[in-house]
Structure formats: structure tokens, C-alpha cells
């Protein structure tokens, strides 16, 4: 909800106020952390540089990072350009901001639901959540082609619901793998997964930019869907490898 809220503040006042708002929220977070975070938390040990080698020579962990990058990043091929997509459907700039705020609420709901799903079987849950995300991206693409504002609005909110539903599962899966294969490097593996999230954002946004330059912004959702599909293939591959290993044992 932060991005659309910042956009709304900037449009209603001045763009400088968005940064003041961000700084204010950061200050509140800093003060809250100082008073609310326990002072007696255990201090983690130093990161072992050799852990990098252990992590990146572990096939399941490497694939988990790729799943994170593609599964999370595909959304941004469309989300980065959601405003012009909505404007092309006839929504005003003010209406787009309101839609994005509601989109943010849908993201929060999706995150919560995704966390519950991921608690059981992360890999199976990721396949379902990625599939729903792909369907929402395809639906958005079709509604834009149809130039149907009502369906486009529905598709955008569906995208918000499914876009980041996978985040808890992606992080949980990496932690589970780290506990299994490199228990001494769990913190480092988690950090690399966060890096994979950001790489995914970069790749997805750049893909959307290239598509917009060479084709049209209309096609960004379908290309985002293809990126997420790559993540699904990786998940299916890893799941098959795990099943074969379990059968062998």
C-alpha cells in the first residue's frame, strides 16, 4: 500500500511531500524498534565467507533463488506499468491512484492467505499460487485488449491479490532448504533470497520496459506471465527431483 499512498500524497500536494511522508514513517519505525524490540536478543555469529560456496554449490538452493527471482519478478513486468495500462482503459489519474490503494489492500490480503497456504507444503502451494498469478496476468492482458474498463479493474484487483501471495512461501522454502543442507548458513541463504527478490524486480521491470518500447505497454502482462511460468517449471523440476530422491531412499 505504500507506493500508491505515496503517489496519492504526491498528486494531492507536491512530489516532495511523498519523501517527507516516507521519512516520517521511517522515523516512527525507528522509534518503535527502539522501544519495542527486546534488548536481550541473541547476537548471530559472524557470516562465514565459505558459506557462500556451500550455498551456491547446493543445487536445490540455487534453484530456489531462481524460483524467487522469476516467480516474484514476473509480476513487475506488469505492475510497473499498471498505471498506464489503467489510463489506457479510460481511468483518470486520480482514479488510478485510488485503484492502486485498493490494489495494495488486496496485496496485504494475498500475503496473509499465502502465508497460511505455505505453512503446509511450500512447493505445492507455490505451484498453485504461481498458477493463479499467471491466470490473473493473462486475464489483465485480455481485458486490456478488449478495452473493457470494468473487467480491467477486476483483473487489476485480482493481480493485487495473487501478485505477492507467494512471498511467504518463497522465503519459507529457502529457510527449510538451508536448515536441511546448510544449517550453519541459514542467515546467509535468507539474505541471498532477499537479493533474488530484488533481482527479480529489476529483471521484471526491465522486461516490461523493453516490451513497452518495442511492442506496446498492452503486452506487459502476458510477458510477465511467461516469466512466472519459468518459475513454475523450476518448481516442478525441483519437486520431481525430491520425489525421485524420496523413492530412492
List the model feature ranges, each with a label.
Residues 25, 30-48, 237-248:
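Helix-loop junctions on the cytosolic side of multi-pass membrane transporters
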Residues 165-181:
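Intracellular juxtamembrane helix-capping segments at the cytosolic ends
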Residues 57-77, 157-161:
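Pair of pore-lining "gating" transmembrane helices in MFS-fold secondary transporters
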Residues 10, 110-123, 212-213:
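Helix-to-loop junctions at the C-terminal end of transmembrane segments
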Residues 177-216:
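A late C-terminal transmembrane helix in Major Facilitator Superfamily
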Residues 11-24, 209-228:
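A membrane-interface helix-boundary motif in multi-pass transporters
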Residues 124-170:
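C-terminal transmembrane helical hairpin of 12-TM major facilitator-type secondary transporters
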Residues 1-37, 41, 63, 68-71, ...:
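Helix-loop-helix hairpin linking two adjacent transmembrane segments in secondary transporters
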Amino acid at each position: 500500500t505504500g507506493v500508491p499512498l505515496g503517489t496519492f500524497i504526491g498528486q494531492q500536494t507536491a512530489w516532495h511531500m511523498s519523501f517527507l511522508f516516507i521519512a516520517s514513517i521511517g522515523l516512527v519505525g525507528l522509534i518503535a524498534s527502539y522501544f519495542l524490540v527486546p534488548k536481550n536478543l541473541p547476537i548471530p555469529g559472524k557470516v562465514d565467507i565459505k558459506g557462500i560456496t556451500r550455498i551456491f554449490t547446493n543445487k536445490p538452493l540455487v534453484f530456489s533463488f531462481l524460483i524467487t527471482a522469476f516467480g516474484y519478478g514476473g509480476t513487475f513486468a506488469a505492475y510497473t506499468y499498471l498505471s498506464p495500462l489503467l489510463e489506457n482503459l479510460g481511468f483518470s489519474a486520480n482514479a488510478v491512484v485510488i485503484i492502486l490503494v485498493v490494489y495494495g489492500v488486496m496485496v496485504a490480503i494475498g500475503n496473509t492467505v499465502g502465508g497460511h497456504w505455505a505453512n503446509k507444503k511450500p512447493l505445492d502451494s507455490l505451484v498453485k499460487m504461481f498458477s493463479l498469478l499467471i491466470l490473473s496476468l493473462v486475464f489483465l492482458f485480455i481485458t486490456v485488449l478488449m478495452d473493457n474498463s470494468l473487467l480491467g479493474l477486476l483483473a487489476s484487483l485480482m493481480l493485487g491479490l495473487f501478485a505477492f501471495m507467494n512471498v511467504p512461501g518463497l522465503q519459507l522454502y529457502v529457510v527449510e532448504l538451508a536448515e536441511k543442507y546448510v544449517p550453519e548458513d541459514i542467515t546467509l541463504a535468507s539474505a541471498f533470497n532477499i537479493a533474488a527478490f530484488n533481482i527479480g524486480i529489476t529483471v521484471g521491470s526491465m522486461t516490461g520496459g523493453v516490451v513497452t518500447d518495442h511492442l506496446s505497454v498492452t503486452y506487459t502482462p502476458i510477458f510477465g506471465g511467461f516469466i512466472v511460468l519459468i518459475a513454475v517449471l523450476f518448481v516442478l523440476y525441483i519437486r520431481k527431483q525430491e520425489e525421485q530422491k524420496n523413492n530412492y531412499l
